[in-house]
Amino acid sequence: GGFFYYLLVSLAFRLGSTLWLIPIQFLSYYLSGSYLYKTVMHMTNKKEIATLISIIFYVTNGTLGFGGLYPIQFAMPFVLGAIFFLTRYFAGHSRDEAFILYGFAGTAGALFEARTLIFWILSLVTIFVYNLVNKHFARGFYQVLCIIFGNILVLYLCLYFILNLQITSDYINQVLVYNFTQLAVEKNDFLLTLAYQSFAVLGSGLLIGALTTSNHLLGDAKDKSIKWVLLLSFIFTVVYSLFSQSFGLYSILNIVPYGLVLTALSLDDAIKKRAERTSHRRRN
């Protein structure tokens, strides 16, 4: 977890119970599901797929994240909100000023769950390459300024507490350095946990989308920039789950935002192929 996560937990203990976190978590679920639904609707234009994926999202959080209050669950609204924003941006439907919100979401999400930085870094690199290829130099520079401004809005509050509490070096070492240098979160048997987590990832069905997205990534495929971000984020994040040396299923929650969107694309492909076969049979 990050600074905002521990701040929320501390406030809950100050108020006497972690039950105070439940309304915040329900709000997080609602916002996450809403952004996920909008993203899937944009990519597939099918309400039934968007609804199904949203239901799977809530079921997955209820099973893999049983008990709740995990950092990634509070970070998901920011991650899925950014995915929806980038989907619209690469489709030409977002204004450059909206990158202030993207910068805000990126910093806030990372301060709830540091490992979401994988997604934020990959998305920033993709935005840079996209602007470079399309020669949007002035727009790219303006977007950077907007992102920095959005970052500052969040970092100012965070740094105020960190500096006043004199925990700067401890925070950097324990939250940032540790999360990206230590894959293991527990000390269970490596091979057993690797087999267990591999089976859990396979059983979750989240690999389906990642393994069937090739036709969405090349040529003139729609929204291919954000799909590359999702696939790479999925791959890098799933490594953390597989090598966590933990029997906890909650580690798979980190791949849910990316895996479900990719799975929605796979479902859309399956429906289209089925419709083509039906149409072909009717002609014959």
Predicted segment positions?
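Short hydrophobic/aromatic helix or loop-helix immediately within or flanking a transmembrane segment
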Residues: 1-16, 26, 109
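Transmembrane-helix signature of polytopic, membrane-embedded enzymes
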Residues: 27, 33-60, 76-77
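Membrane-interface transmembrane helices that cradle and orient dolichyl/undecaprenyl
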Residues: 44, 80-101, 133, 210-222, ...
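Short acidic/glycine- and proline-prone juxtamembrane loop motifs at membrane-interface regions
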Residues: 65-75
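Short hydrophobic alpha-helices at membrane interfaces in multi-pass membrane enzymes
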Residues: 85-108, 137, 142, 146, ...
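Membrane-interface alpha helices of multi-pass inner-membrane proteins
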Residues: 97-114, 120, 125, 234-243
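Hydrophobic/aromatic-rich transmembrane helices and adjacent perimembrane loops
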Residues: 118, 244-279
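Perimembrane helix-loop-helix junctions
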Residues: 119-152, 217, 261, 273
